[in-house]
């Protein structure tokens, strides 16, 4: 199955800005890979919470629409809130 997630590039980096984003219902994330610069991104929590419940989310190639450009990635790691059904951060790897 194909998954598409709209995202924007993050300009503010750090714990404080990540907390502000989470309060607004957004998820900070990073895309990295060999030979490419890491890119900090942010997307809406509602865009990923339902698709990550599918079993093939972690093994399939995802498409992130980053500022109008499509990037193919795989989910590498996901940090979740301790007791709330929320995602705190996602690491993606270039596919």
From Swiss-Prot:
Residues making up the signal peptide according to the UniProt record: none
GO cellular component: cytosolic large ribosomal subunit
Gene Ontology biological-process annotations: translation
Known partners and oligomeric status: Part of the 50S ribosomal subunit; part of the 5S rRNA/L5/L18/L25 subcomplex. Contacts the 5S rRNA. Binds to the 5S rRNA independently of L5 and L18.
Family recorded in the similarity comment: Belongs to the bacterial ribosomal protein bL25 family.
PANTHER family attached to this UniProt entry: RIBOSOMAL PROTEIN L25/GLN-TRNA SYNTHETASE, ANTI-CODON-BINDING DOMAIN-CONTAINING PROTEIN (PTHR33284), RIBOSOMAL PROTEIN L25_GLN-TRNA SYNTHETASE, ANTI-CODON-BINDING DOMAIN-CONTAINING PROTEIN (PTHR33284:SF1)
Function in brief: This is one of the proteins that binds to the 5S RNA in the ribosome where it forms part of the central protuberance.
Name of the protein described by the UniProt record: Large ribosomal subunit protein bL25
Species for this entry: Shewanella amazonensis (strain ATCC BAA-1098 / SB2B)
